[in-house]
Amino acid sequence: MIKSNRITACALAALFAGASFSASAWWGGPGYGNGLWDNMGDMFGDGYGDFNMSMGGGGRGYGRGYGRGNGYGYGAPYGYGAPYGYGAPYGYGAPYGYGAPYGAMPYGAMPPQMPAAPAQPQAAPSR
């Protein structure tokens, strides 16, 4: 009798276990794919996704200028200051400035300067 009760108990346990497993799979509990936990997940924090920090931008502009010259820059014929660009003939502050044929003036040398104007006597302050 005890042996038959054990066999019956084991058979009932297997029957209930099988029924619960099939019910979980049929009704779609967590992990079975019916979307029951789509919004909360299993709350273990082991999700997946795609992340990208690329960004871009652009802009548009519109404006009007004061067209001077013949299309090559400000002033004729080819840029700021004739004939070839910034401060003819060779660049800013010719002959040794920016764009000079062999570079700027060596260190320690002073560029040529205008002589100082004579000092004017200062007028006495009025009372």
From Swiss-Prot:
* Alphabetized InterPro entries for the sequence: SGP
Annotated signal sequence is 1-25
What Pfam family is a match for this entry?
A: SGP
Task: State if DNA-binding is listed as a keyword.
Answer: no
Give the superkingdom in one word.
Bacteria
- Keywords, in A-Z order: Signal
| Protein function | Structural protein of the sulfur globules, which are intracellular globules that serve for sulfur storage in purple sulfur bacteria.
Q: Which family does it belong to?
A: To C.vinosum CV2 and T.roseopersicina TR0.
Assembly, in brief, is: The protein envelope of the sulfur globules is composed of the three different proteins CV1, CV2 and CV3.
Protein name as it appears in the record: Sulfur globule protein CV1
List the source organism.
Answer: Allochromatium vinosum (strain ATCC 17899 / DSM 180 / NBRC 103801 / NCIMB 10441 / D)
Cite the source lineage. Bacteria, Pseudomonadati, Pseudomonadota, Gammaproteobacteria, Chromatiales
